């Protein structure tokens, strides 16, 4: 792999590994388990590697992302797809799953928590890497005896807890990459580390529309690349080794997250069942 492809992985891959194999207690071995997993925000940096690890471990993966980003996920072998613009519950059920064993929410869980409560199987695991300023109605999970698992990649270093395990995880990931079981998640590469490219990369992140990972590659230089050197590659044409950079303007179909565009945030259980979950709530 190139330096950029390698640099795209460590933080997101360790996050995904810890969520799956430590927090959710899924066996960390090839085809070691079975069952199903719903991944919300599957085309992002963590999602793009997490779906690969979940498949490697033996899980059936259902990926939630904007339709424009489905080709990105399909190149990783993910073919069960749902669009976050529409209600998730009927989409997942249409794929043949009344409930799933695991749900990984890699974006603010608030807009999705009703669907999560409906779709998670009894004794299942719901994992999140994203905090929210709103209260989550976790009591909705109680009657199914569902575990809610949080993952934060800096927990170990912040509290000096089993820090050596992250180096061991990187060694496992390196072996899987060398064996071809995993692929890099780089989607955008800026050639040259300079103020303009840093501003462009930051602007990309602030749109919350990116897929995969962004890298900036040496050399360090003081001059920006010309606009013509920054090209958007349509998702349909992604190739394994293609490095694409951010366009001077955003694509028409941005990856806006459901329930957040207008600032309205809803916590409503789809079935309206009040038992142990309280009344429908709006924030």
Model-predicted regions and their roles:
Residues 140-189, 279-282:
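C-terminal substrate-binding/catalytic core of Rossmann-like NAD(P)-dependent dehydrogenases/reductases
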Residues 175, 181-188, 199-244:
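C-terminal capping/lid region of NAD(P)-dependent oxidoreductase domains
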Residues 101-104, 244:
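N-terminal Rossmann-like NAD(P) cofactor-binding module of classical short-chain dehydrogenase/reductase
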Residues 120-121:
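Helix-to-beta-strand junctions that scaffold the AdoMet/dcAdoMet cofactor pocket
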Residues 7-86, 236-243, 247-283:
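Mid-domain Rossmann-like dinucleotide-binding core that forms the NAD(H)/NADP(H) cofactor-binding site
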Residues 87-98:
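Short amphipathic alpha-helix with an adjacent loop that forms part of the alpha/beta core around
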Residues 124-125, 147:
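Short glycine-centered segments of the SAM/dcSAM-binding site in methyltransferase folds
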